[in-house]
Swiss-Prot record:
This is Probable UDP-sugar transporter protein SLC35A4. The chain crosses the membrane at residues 21-41, 55-75, 89-109, 146-166, 176-196, 207-227, 243-263, 268-290. Pfam families: Nuc_sug_transp. It comes from the Eukaryota. Keywords: Golgi apparatus, Membrane, Sugar transport, Transmembrane, Transmembrane helix, Transport. One of its GO terms (molecular function) is pyrimidine nucleotide-sugar transmembrane transporter activity. The lineage of its organism: Eukaryota, Metazoa, Chordata, Craniata, Vertebrata. It is found in: Golgi apparatus membrane. Residues 1-20, 76-88, 167-175, 228-242, 291-314 are cytoplasmic. Mediates the transport of CDP-ribitol. Does not exhibit CMP-sialic acid, UDP-galactose and UDP-N-acetylglucosamine transport activity. One of its GO terms (biological process) is transmembrane transport. It catalyses: CDP-L-ribitol(in) + CDP(out) = CDP-L-ribitol(out) + CDP(in). It comes from Danio rerio. The gene is slc35a4.
Length: 314
């Protein structure tokens, strides 16, 4: 794990720490970007061969055990005995519920819109996160930084619409109902709220990050275990697991733990840049591994994201 002191911020620290921070962000971009291509690789007859709920539960449980091991290794167990209370731990239940709600909402809303419409409109979560970041955390963005957020939204929309050569491959008509539009707006709001709330909780409590993760993932395991048991899953817990699936699990475990570092020591806006950059990695890996054809317009979102990074951080 990349160690960053609780009293240091990446922007105002030594060159060595900035280099570690950059490495962490690049690693996150790679993990995020490789997730969808890896899922495609493990599909059989266009279907995911394993239980999605068991996979999520396994990921949450792994993050919980790693957080506990990290807490033991840091020698902060005595702090844990002092810090355990409902007042301290209960705020971490909110992100678990919000993320679980959104995971189910994504599946539910597919009946009210086509996948392409969802992919395009889900980029509005960038705007919702930025708005909640300024209103709930009291942070102020300059005009050029707001413009950078607009560039990220534009990059996501243009990438979804124009980067892939889908001629002759579109199987469903483009449509969205008024109910579907409302649901996708709720999805974007909840996504932003979960990110901003998590950042606020992590930064407001002066506790070791491993301890905060322990609280966070305990609730994550409880919520996802309840979801798995109530879902009537027909497949065995590890049925359909291949080497690629285990790579996905390991990647998502690392992704969650590293993203908590970003939320603790960076900002939710940094998370948005990671996710936006990851869609470009996703496209390149899909082209290289899956043979997906890219159009010349792929360079347009690349330029927009690069411009957004320059405007926001300079």
């Amino acid at each position: 794990m990349i160690a960053i002191s609780a009293d240091e911020s990446p922007e105002s620290s030594s060159p060595a720490l900035r280099l570690r921070w950059l490495f962490l962000l690049l690693l996150l971009v790679l993990i995020y970007g490789s997730h969808a291509p890896l899922l495609s690789l493990c599909k059989t007859q266009a279907q995911i061969p394993f239980s999605a709920s068991s996979c999520v539960l396994l990921i949450e449980t792994s993050k919980l055990f790693i957080s506990f091991a990290s807490l033991l290794a840091s020698g902060s167990v005595s702090t844990l005995r002092i810090s355990i209370s409902m007042t301290t731990a209960s705020p971490y239940a909110v992100p678990a519920v919000l993320y679980a709600f959104n995971n189910h909402l994504v599946v539910f809303m597919q009946a009210y819109m086509d996948p392409s419409s969802f992919q395009v409109l889900s980029n509005l979560k960038i705007a919702s996160t930025a708005l909640l970041y300024t209103s709930c955390l009291g942070k102020r963005l300059h005009r050029r930084q707001w413009f950078a957020m607009g560039l990220l939204v534009s990059a996501g929309v243009s990438h979804s619409c124009f980067s892939y050569d889908l001629e002759g491959k579109r199987e469903t008509a483009v449509y969205i109902t008024s109910w579907g539009l409302l649901l996708v707006l709720v999805y974007c709001f909840v996504s932003g709220l979960a990110a901003v709330y998590t950042e606020r909780v992590l930064k407001s409590q002066r506790l070791p990050l491993s301890m905060q993760n322990l609280f966070l993932y305990t609730f994550g395991v409880v919520v996802n275990l309840a979801s798995h048991l109530s879902g009537g899953e027909q497949k065995g817990f590890f049925e359909g697991y291949s080497a690629v699936v285990w790579v996905i699990v390991a990647g998502q475990v690392a992704n969650g733990l590293l993203m908590s570092v970003v939320m603790k020591h960076g900002t939710g806006i940094t998370r948005l840049f990671v996710i936006s950059s990851a869609m470009l990695v996703n496209a390149v890996l899909s082209w290289g591994i899956l043979g997906v054809q890219l159009t010349g317009y792929f360079l347009f979102p690349v330029v927009l994201i690069g411009w957004a990074v320059y405007l926001y951080y300079t």
